Amino acid sequence: MAANLLEQLRGMTVVVADTGGIQSIATFTPRDATTNPSLITAAAQMPQYQSIIDDTLRQVRTELGAEAPVEAIVAEAIDELFVAFGLRILEIVPGRVSTEVDARLSYDTEATIAKARKLIGLYERAGIRRDRVLIKIASTWEGIRAAEVLEKEGIHCNLTLLFGFHQAVACAEAGVTLISPFVGRILDWYKKESGRDAFPGAEDPGVQSVTQIYNYYKKFGYATEVMGASFRNISEIIELAGCDLLTISPGLLEELRQTEALLERKLDPAIAESLELEQIHLDRDRFAELHQADRMANEKLDEGIRGFCKAIDTLEGLLKQRLAVLEGKAVFHHAAHEVFSVCDLDGDGFITREEWLGSDAVFDALDLNKDGKLNEEDLLAGLGATLQMAGRAVATV
């Protein structure tokens, strides 16, 4: 009986988990893992990761101080949160984790370099070596130039949102560690453009793109690794067996694990080296010319950057809401303690109706067990109801 497809694939390709979900990574035990803003934003809304969010927000508030504005707290927390998830992932995988630079910096070389250095600094502060982290950067001309600088500093880069052959060539010439061509998104574009429902097997345009890039890299001896990404079905994965790396979602990993069939290696360095190919070189103008001519790559890169920017904006909103709740709790705890201290005139740990400085109606509302006295928890419970109402109000803004 043949082994399952996942086991066979691991014998010829490095399997990477494409998820921000720590539990999924633990289930499939990949060598590496990749994350992106959309995955982290999704994970941030799952109850099992609430402690990571809360701990990060509290830590940043402590670091920046009580007077720091909410915007500064949230901006810093996003960087720290990406690294916090990365650290949890690195406790599971033996290899590398990819952490993405803010997509809003995709056309700013210097800002991308600065952000990458900061992220690596956060990892190093936590005791993680540089060789265990890949900094994900969009494959714009500006992003590729940033990666070229970072690679010379020993900061390894994963160039993402790669759709065109010209992007792959520029990345190889820049000496980046790894690229992530988006197989499924390329397929999506051609299906919409052509009106076809499917492109089976080797006809899949995304598969053809990765195959072309892989063969070119191996033919001309580029060290840059090719990691196929964004798969829509296991057929695409089967057609790219032998690629350096493939980053695969948990759902497709499970489907591969449940499928027993013989897996044939499709990509091979020896075959690539035997091909007749022409080597090309790109400067900024030639890159721009080719990018403009490749409508699919042009549109999908723009769409991908906008999508990741939207995910970051959403994450910022979620963190602002959560910070308001966390800091509201602290305020209410303090307020309850202050009110209790003022009213507990004899210091016996209770406030009687005679000691209460407010109205009888409020006292009766707080005295839930109707024993004629209030403790600090009674006050906190009453204020807590107000807090919950405030939290719901913030969530609807």
Curated annotation (Swiss-Prot):
Entry annotation: catalytic residues: 136 (schiff-base intermediate with substrate)
One GO cellular component term noted in the UniProt record for this chain: cytoplasm
Keyword Cytoplasm: yes
InterPro entries assigned: Aldolase_TIM, EF-hand-dom_pair, EF_Hand_1_Ca_BS, EF_hand_dom, TAL/FSA, Transaldolase_1, Transaldolase_AS
Keyword field: Cytoplasm, Pentose shunt, Schiff base, Transferase
Entry's Gene Ontology BP terms: carbohydrate metabolic process; pentose-phosphate shunt
A Pfam family of this chain: TAL_FSA
Reactions it catalyzes: D-sedoheptulose 7-phosphate + D-glyceraldehyde 3-phosphate = D-erythrose 4-phosphate + beta-D-fructose 6-phosphate
GO molecular function, one term: transaldolase activity
Record-listed E.C. numbers: 2.2.1.2
Metabolic or biological pathway, per its Swiss-Prot or TrEMBL entry: Carbohydrate degradation; pentose phosphate pathway; D-glyceraldehyde 3-phosphate and beta-D-fructose 6-phosphate from D-ribose 5-phosphate and D-xylulose 5-phosphate (non-oxidative stage): step 2/3
Localization of this protein: Cytoplasm
Protein family according to the UniProt entry: Belongs to the transaldolase family. Type 1 subfamily.
Subunit structure: Homodimer.
Task performed by this protein: Transaldolase is important for the balance of metabolites in the pentose-phosphate pathway.
Name used for this protein in its record: Transaldolase
Record organism: Synechococcus sp. (strain ATCC 27144 / PCC 6301 / SAUG 1402/1)
